[in-house]
Amino acid sequence: MNIHDPILERPSQCETHGEFIAKCFMNNHWTKCQTCSTEERAKEARDTLNAELRAKTARLNAKINNAGIPQRFVNKTLSSYVIDTNNDKQCAIFAFCTDYALDFEQVMKTGKSFMLLGSVGTGKTHLSIGIALEIIKRGHSAIFTSASKMFRNVKETYNNKGKSENEVLSAFTECDLLIIDEVGVQRGTDYEKDIMFDVINDRYENLRPTIILSNLSVEETKAHLGERVFDRLRENGGKAFLLNWNSYRSIAEAVNYQAVEFAS
């Protein structure tokens, strides 16, 4: 039988779906139950989709793991952040963070940075990690670190024949978004200020945004970081937001929230 021969048909029986008409097209090959064939194709499509989803999830989890986000905070998304809808300013900072994450492609064109400052437990870490998780989901890279850990990682290269100082610093300078937590709990030595400047300045020059988290006030943060770092963070409309409502961790009622632009 060749391709020009007429199609042959014959009744056949499927153990699952019962009677069907089998067809022979060429090489004496008879078709299977059409319903079985349709189900097999659908299963193959589902299996392919599930495999792609598993691979995508694995890649996302790897990026989150590489971002240095502590296990306690890996589920701290923006959508899980609880706000007091009666507090207009808390709603405003949440809206700012949400827009920052959703418009991150535009943020990367300007390198716009900002700070979340103020009292312990007001949700600064949650908001910043929520931004990181959102941009990672969108294909960008992020690093979350404390200032102390960043300084320690650099110092460890001095007595280590493994990574060089430049290799360690590149992890902080080359990611799309860098979040530096606990700024201000260090001694603020010249060495620490120099490392901070090197990181922030490199990111500033390459339009890579940075988020600073600190329990200090605006003026205290400025004094701790130094004029050079502070000036670079305020470029392109960089802002400092002062969170001074009651502890977010206890889900208490929110009070006074003030958003403050960098002083000129």
Language model features with spans:
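Short glycine-rich substrate-engagement loop in P-loop NTPases that contacts/grips substrate
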Residues: 90-97, 134-174
